[in-house]
Amino acid sequence: MDASENGATAPEKHDDGESFTKVKSKKSQKRKLEPDGGITMEVEQPNKRPHFPPISADKLRGPDEMRKVAVPAHRYTPLKENWLKIFTPIVENLQLQVRFNLKTRNVEIKTCKETQDIAALTKAADFIKAFVLGFQVDDAMALIRLDELFLESFDVTDVKPLKGDHLSRAIGRIAGKGGKTKFTIENVTKTRIVLADTKIHILGSFQNIKMARTAICNLILGSPPSKVYGNIRAVASRTAERF
């Protein structure tokens, strides 16, 4: 039986080879890189971290800042007598401007172009404040030289609400005969203490202020000085061994 009789026709053959076209898949195009410049992949360059150089003190400094420290009447004479010792470290070491305003009775401290340290204004204000509270100039000057020193103030009545003779006896226990108790606490705890009526001011490091405050509070609450001496010496020896 012939194929023509069944009505079926055979497919025609083309010899030119264009009957089938090979199509490349997109995946193979992405994976294969042709060196002759046919297909190329763009690789994103990693972003470089921004570089910010340190800013100098002149650019960082904004408008001039000022601090004012009020001086009570009973500290006018000591301030006048020690004025040379007070303004010399503020001007030479901290590069600040300082003056005493006679109208407002304030010590005014101001920054200027020569000021390098940002914290200089705070150090100078703490130095003046310590002197106004009653500390000696040499003791208060440690606030300028050292960064880890602080001032703490509290009232005797904050520890125990005492009145009249009871309050006077509590202050006397803190001071001791001829100031012996106060000097002992200062030497053991390496702090400086000022008793101003019912106010107590302590100058020292954080840990030493804590030791001195605990000893003074125990004296206010009625503990005998001998027991307080033993306690602070034990705490001081333990702290020295730890550090």
Curated annotation (Swiss-Prot):
SMART domains attached to this UniProt entry: KH (SM00322)
Chief localisation class: nucleus
The record, for CDD domains, names: KH-I_PNO1_rpt1, KH-I_PNO1_rpt2
Regions of compositional bias (Basic and acidic residues) in chain numbering: 11-21
Location of the region described as Disordered in the Swiss-Prot/TrEMBL record: 1-60
Q: Which SUPFAM superfamilies match?
A: Eukaryotic type KH-domain (KH-domain type I) (SSF54791)
Q: Which residues form a coiled coil?
A: none
A cellular-component GO term for this protein: nucleus
Superkingdom of the source species: Eukaryota
User: Which cell locations does it reside in?
Assistant: Nucleus, Nucleolus
Q: Where is the KH domain?
A: 164-216
Concerning InterPro entries, the annotation shows: KH-I_PNO1_first, KH_dom, KH_dom_type_1_sf, KH_PNO1_2nd, KRR1-like_KH1
Name of a matching Pfam family: KH_KRR1_1st
| One BP term from GO | ribosome biogenesis
Keyword terms? Nucleus, RNA-binding
Transmembrane spans: none
Q: What does this protein do?
A: Positively regulates dimethylation of two adjacent adenosines in the loop of a conserved hairpin near the 3'-end of 18S rRNA.
Which family does the record assign? Answer: Belongs to the PNO1 family.
Q: What is this protein called in UniProt? A: RNA-binding protein PNO1
